[in-house]
Structures are given as C-alpha cells and as structure tokens.
C-alpha cells in the first residue's frame, strides 16, 4: 500500500495477514464443548517498508500500475513533475523516470494508469491546463519512457482531474467548469513490403506511436463551478455503455451516460446525457467506483463519505454514509 503527503514523501507499506488458531488446554480433561474458548482474531501486521524521496513539493497522488508490468508506482506533485518508481528488490524502489524539467508549467494534480491492455502508460493533468500521457516504449516495464501532451490548453486556468477509461479514452476536468473526453485519432496502416526480424520487433511499438494522436471528442457541460474530479466507471458486466462520474465545487455529482440512440458500432458521434446523483450543498472533492462499476463512493467538504447505487429505474440512492 502506498501513501503520499505534503511532507514531500511517499511511503510504501508491506502488508501481511497471519491467523493463529486456539487449541485445547492440554490438561487431559478434554475440551469444554458447552463453552469453547473464543477463537483468536486474525492479526494484521503492517510495517513501514520504505520511504521514497525525490519530489520537491507536496505529493498529491500515487497510483499503482497493473501487476502485469511489475511493481510500478506513479506519483505526481506540486513540483511540476510525474515520477515513476519501480521495485527492484524486496521493499527497495528506484526512480526510473521523471518528466523533463519544464514539461509541465504547474502543479501536477492527478494521474491515472491506462487499462493494461492499452500498454504501460499513465495520464496526468496539471494546473498549467495541460493533459499528458507518459508511456513506456515497450511492454517491458522499466524500459525507455516518453512524455507527450494531449493538449497544452485542455482546460482554462487549470486541470484538476483525469481518468483513463476501459474504452481507451481519457476524461479530464478543470477550473473551466467542464469535463472533456479525449480519444485517439485514427492511425495509418503500416506500409507493405518485406519486414526484417528487427522490424517485426518494433512494428507494434511504431503502431502505438502513430496512435498517440489524441483529439477532443466531447465537452460535458453541467457544472457551474470548478470540477474537482472525474472518474470513468469500469465496464459493468461487460456492457459497452460508458458512464462517467463528475463532482464539483458547486456541490453536484453528475453521472454521464453515453447515449445509445443509434445502432452504430462506433462512438465517434454518440453524445452523453447526465443524471444528477445528488446536490450535496458543499464542495465535493473525490469520487471512486467499485470494481464492477455499480457503486460510487463520494467524499465532500463536510468530511463525509457516502456510497451510492443505481436502481433499476436509473435513479441513484444512498446506501451508506460514514
């Protein structure tokens, strides 16, 4: 488990669970069947494994890559950088990449890894208004890394949140009261002719580079103040219908659902309609979907976390508050 702090550090905790069981007292009289001893509870041991230093400002977020790529951790900071960390041996992490100086011209506020099937890549957004993708040049984690901007002017005044969806599209939000959806432009097909063995090794990577041409697909308008977070729901039961949750300084949480008003298999011309989950009457900071995308957790400025679930009629109801 990784945590980050305004003290500029990242802490990685190695968690483990051990369970011990009780046995008879060995006194020769047999167990008291009527009043057996209570079972001993599981003991959870948590030890501070390591502290990662290197950021020169508060660290806002950390996020683990898919295990397919090994123990890779991304971090973003007020110091204008994204860093990639790799576990090189047990509880030992090395920094394998940092975005170049000047690549971001403001605090990097949020990061989101791509679903593993789209490669080893993480999206990041900054107070300078830009959205970027940092990706490994191969499917082998720890290989060469590169950074590229999706847009230098994604959100006026600044970008506050980013989420990489399972449809290989990126959602971002910002201080312009908007959520935006970014999709890859069409890549050209590879040329003909004979291919050497070396060409075969790099052909897939070259195709990936061609596909890294992102374009704005949709603007989602509904909030009246800064949008603080946006989160793409995991595909619910394998459904092709896309859902995005957004929350704002205006106190509202919206659920945006891709319209399904035509039979086209492409999403290029589809729109999104919104449903107001709730007006919390205070700023809403963060959102988090359950693994299957059917439950949404919401945290607000009243120090409350509430959990919401969609009913069969499309309305959202609160199921837990803590």
Describe every region a protein language model picked out:
Residues 4-7, 75-79, 124-128, 136, ...:
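Conserved strand-to-loop turn within each blade of WD40 beta-propeller repeats
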Residues 270-322:
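C-terminal interaction modules of eukaryotic adaptor/scaffold proteins
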Residues 48, 58, 69, 107, ...:
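WD40/WD-repeat beta-propeller blade-loop signature
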Residues 63-70, 112-119, 161-168, 231-241, ...:
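Loop/turn segments within WD40 beta-propeller blades
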Residues 45, 52-59, 99-108, 151-159, ...:
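WD40/WD-repeat beta-propeller blade N-cap
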């Amino acid at each position: 488990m990784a945590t980050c702090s305004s003290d500029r550090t990242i802490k990685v905790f190695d968690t483990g669970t051990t369970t011990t069981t009780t046995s008879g007292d060995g006194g020769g009289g047999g167990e008291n069947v009527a009043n057996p001893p209570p079972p001993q509870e599981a003991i959870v041991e948590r030890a501070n494994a390591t502290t990662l230093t290197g950021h020169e400002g508060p660290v806002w977020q950390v996020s683990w890559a898919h295990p397919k790529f090994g123990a890779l951790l991304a971090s973003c900071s007020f110091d204008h950088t994204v860093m990639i960390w790799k576990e090189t041996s047990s509880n030992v992490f090395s920094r394998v990449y940092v975005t170049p100086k000047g690549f971001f011209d403001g605090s990097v506020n949020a990061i989101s890894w791509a679903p593993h099937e789209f490669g080893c890549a993480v999206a990041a957004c900054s107070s300078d208004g830009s959205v970027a993708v940092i990706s490994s040049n191969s499917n082998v984690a720890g290989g060469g890394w590169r950074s590229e901007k999706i847009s230098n002017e994604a959100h006026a005044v600044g970008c506050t949140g980013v989420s990489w969806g399972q449809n290989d599209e990126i959602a971002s939000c910002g201080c312009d009261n908007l959520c935006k959806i970014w999709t890859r432009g069409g890549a050209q097909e590879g040329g003909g002719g004979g291919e050497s063995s070396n060409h075969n090794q790099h052909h897939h990577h070259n195709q990936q580079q061609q596909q890294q041409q992102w374009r704005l697909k949709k603007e989602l308008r509904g909030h009246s103040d800064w949008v603080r977070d946006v989160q793409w729901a995991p595909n619910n039961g394998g459904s092709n219908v896309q859902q995005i949750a957004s929350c704002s300084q205006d106190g509202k949480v919206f659920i945006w659902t891709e319209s399904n008003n035509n039979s086209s298999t492409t999403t290029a011309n589809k729109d999104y309609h919104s449903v107001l989950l709730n007006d919390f009457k205070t700023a809403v900071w963060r959102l988090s979907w359950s693994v299957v995308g059917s439950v949404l957790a919401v945290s607000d400025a009243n120090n409350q976390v509430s959990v919401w679930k969609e009913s069969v009629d499309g309305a959202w109801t609160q199921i837990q508050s803590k």
